[in-house]
């Protein structure tokens, strides 16, 4: 099965280890992975800030970049959600409507792809630690990927898991929200940090780098000894 990696901006710029883990994991599961070098931002930050015209320029670039891909897989529920929104945004554009739908239909968040396309729940991972899981807003509320991460994590050997209190609450990142509404964002992430502490976890797992950077940064500033790991890194642990 051929898979094109949609790496996302945050992974490409700040968390390249997540991209590497994603590729290694997919290859171990029998996928042939390529990386279309024409990919840029999915357009979400510009779109959410109201710059629809500018956002669509990026979206068209991404549609063209992945037009020949069999499957597109991303280690981000948030950015995958943006791809799934393309058909709605281009529905009145005869030139791009069909292309946008084709891209949306073949694009998957990593855990969704592993469980529901590859049909795998045990990837053979081992990680001896105490952990909890933060579920991102876009991934659960908009993309509808809720059970897949835990289906995979439940098979990780050595992983002692505790459910995160208030797991459905936003961490306060929200892309530009954390900049435009910094004080509110700070209060939200402080609440999330308190919930993480309650679990006694040594590792906080997440599926979106934006959330992990936000919560991880706050944990660091408060001198909390909790490591953050993307779920791709956990599932790639041997």
Curated annotation (Swiss-Prot):
Query: What family does the entry list?
Result: Belongs to the LutA/YkgE family.
- Write out the GO cellular component annotations: cytosol
Induction record:
Is under the dual control of the transcriptional repressors LutR and SinR, which allows the lutABC operon to be induced during both growth in liquid culture and biofilm formation. Is induced by L-lactate, which relieves LutR repression.
InterPro entries with a match to the protein in the record = Cys_rich_dom (IPR004017), LutA (IPR022822)
Quote one Gene Ontology molecular function term.
oxidoreductase activity
PANTHER family linked: LACTATE UTILIZATION PROTEIN A, UNCHARACTERIZED PROTEIN YKGE
Its protein name is Lactate utilization protein A
Q: What happens when the gene is disrupted?
A: Cells lacking this gene are unable to grow on minimal medium with L-lactate as the sole carbon source. Cells lacking the lutABC operon exhibit little or no defect in biofilm formation on MSgg medium, but form small colonies that almost completely lacked surface architecture when glycerol is replaced with L-lactate in the MSgg medium.
One Gene Ontology biological process: lactate metabolic process
Per the entry, what this protein does is:
Is essential for L-lactate degradation and allows cells to grow with lactate as the sole carbon source. May also allow cells to utilize an alternative carbon source during biofilm formation, since it contributes to the formation of architecturally complex communities when lactate is present.
